[in-house]
Amino acid sequence: HADGVFTSDFSRLLGQLSAKKYLESLIXXXXXXXXXXXXXXXXXHSDAVFTDNYTRLRKQMAVKKYLNSILNGKR
């Protein structure tokens, strides 16, 4: 019984870690795309681009913090 409980808990933990890695890779890929977009549009509307990218980054950071809190069992 103890082995089954350990295996179940360990499998759940591995699933959470996999989900966390996947979401972090999505966030990192979106941040890299935002940085590339900022470099391409450096001349035109730089203030608006900065504000938009900053807002996206803040939202991504908030999502990452929320997901980390859920995956780590805190709310």
UniProtKB/Swiss-Prot annotation:
Q: Which residues carry this modification: Asparagine amide?
A: 72
Name positions with the PTM Isoleucine amide.
27
- The signal peptide, as residue positions, is none
What GO terms fall under cellular component here?
A: extracellular region
Task: Cite the GO molecular-function annotations of the record.
Answer: hormone activity; neuropeptide hormone activity; type 1 vasoactive intestinal polypeptide receptor binding
Report the transmembrane regions from the record.
none
GO BP terms: namely: adenylate cyclase-activating G protein-coupled receptor signaling pathway; mRNA stabilization; positive regulation of protein catabolic process; prolactin secretion; regulation of protein localization
Q: Does the keyword Transport apply?
A: no
Q: Which residues form a coiled coil?
A: none
Question: Entry's PROSITE patterns?
Answer: GLUCAGON
- Compartments where found: Secreted
Superkingdom as given in the UniProt entry: Eukaryota
Is Glycosyltransferase found in the keyword set? no
Which UniProt keyword terms apply here?
A: Amidation, Cleavage on pair of basic residues, Hormone, Secreted
A Pfam family matched in the record: Hormone_2
InterPro entries hit by this protein: Glucagon_GIP_secretin_VIP, VIP/GHRH-like
In the record, the note on similarity to other proteins reads: Belongs to the glucagon family.
Tell me what else is known.
Answer: X's at positions 28 to 44 were included by homology with the human precursor sequence.
Q: What is this protein called?
A: VIP peptides
Native organism:
Sus scrofa (Pig)
Q: What is the lineage of its organism?
A: Eukaryota, Metazoa, Chordata, Craniata, Vertebrata
